[in-house]
Amino acid sequence: MVRNNIKIGFIGVGYMGYGMALNILKRKYNLNIIAHTNRKSINKLVKLGAMELKTYKNFAINSNVIIICVTNTIIAKKVINSLKSFLIKGTLIIDITTHNQNGSIEIFNMLKSRSVYYCESPVMGGPKQAELGILGAIVGCEKNIFN
């Protein structure tokens, strides 16, 4: 995928997600965001060039890579339920949520029938490292998706 064709959607631009979303903008990617709970971060990112979309439908159809950075599995499942009927075939979902033991498997199973790609990628570090762009990550997905 060419950088100009990559339309990244980010859900969860709060405590950890703000710094990650900020770095996506710094690298000149198109960034779509949708309000989850934190308006302050949304407003800052919009001023820096992010596009705030108001509905999950518009968010899903205008993003071919979606990053989900929410607090836990329960919230992640609610987000997926809101998105899944609008996801376009071939969309890549990168889930950096802190899940419970079976959370990522449950999310994967929720998405199986949608012809999208799912990648679990918990990160190591905190908000400061997120803003500096120096988080570590563990990636779990099918090899062809990773490549």
Roles of regions detected by a PLM:
Residues 1-68, 127-130:
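NAD(P)+-binding Rossmann beta1-loop-alpha1 motif at the extreme N-terminus of oxidoreductases
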Residues 8-10, 99-147:
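Rossmann-fold dinucleotide-binding core
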Residues 37-39, 72, 142:
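Residues in the short beta-alpha loop(s) of Rossmann-like NAD(P)-binding domains
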Residues 52, 93, 137-139:
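Generic preference for hydrophobic
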Residues 56-118:
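Rossmann-fold NAD(P) dinucleotide-binding segment
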